[in-house]
Each structure stands twice: as structure tokens, then as C-alpha cells.
Amino acid sequence: MSAYCQVTGRKPSFGKSVSHSHRRTNRRWNPNIQRRTFYLPSEGRSITLNVSTKGLKTIDRDGIESVVAKIRARGEKI
């Protein structure tokens, strides 16, 4: 899935667009996904993650090592 955050698990949300005449059509709101490369000092290599902007704040707060450990605990391969 392209619009999926590997850190927070955010996915597109769905809803309706409502026009001036109140006609409703389906639409989706995509999360703000950024493809970022992070260096893991413990492994001596870089990894590339698809992360939302909220996921970037999580990495800044908790550190890349602990975030990668949580992703691997969920069973995702990095």
C-alpha cells in the first residue's frame, strides 16, 4: 500500500465531498507520506521508510532505534 505509514500505521481515510447543492461523492484523504532514509548506527547501514509527518515527530521524540524495534516487533521486514 503506497499511502501507508510504517511507523504509525496511518492509512487513507474515506468520506464524502459535499458540493454547494449537497450532492455527495466519495473521496479519500491520504496521509502526508514522506519517503525518508535513516542511518542505524547499531547495524551500520541505512534504511528507507515511508513515514507520515506524525511518524517523523515520533522518530524525533523516541529515536530511530526504538522505532525500528517496534516495527520489527509487529512483524514487518525492514
UniProtKB/Swiss-Prot annotation:
InterPro entries in the record, alphabetically? Bacterial_rp_bL28 (IPR050096), Ribosomal_bL28 (IPR026569), Ribosomal_bL28/bL31-like_sf (IPR034704), Ribosomal_bL28_bact-type (IPR001383), Ribosomal_bL28_sf (IPR037147)
One GO BP annotation of this record: translation
Ordered alphabetically, the record's keywords are:
Ribonucleoprotein, Ribosomal protein
Q: Name one Pfam family in it.
A: Ribosomal_L28
Question: Where are the stretches annotated Disordered?
Answer: 1-26
Q: Where in this chain does the entry annotate a coiled-coil region?
A: none
Task: State a single Gene Ontology molecular function.
Answer: structural constituent of ribosome
- GO cellular component term of the entry, any: ribosome
**UniProt record similarity statement:** Belongs to the bacterial ribosomal protein bL28 family.
Against NCBIfam families, the record matches this protein to:
L28 (TIGR00009)
Protein name (record): Large ribosomal subunit protein bL28
Q: Which gene encodes it?
A: rpmB
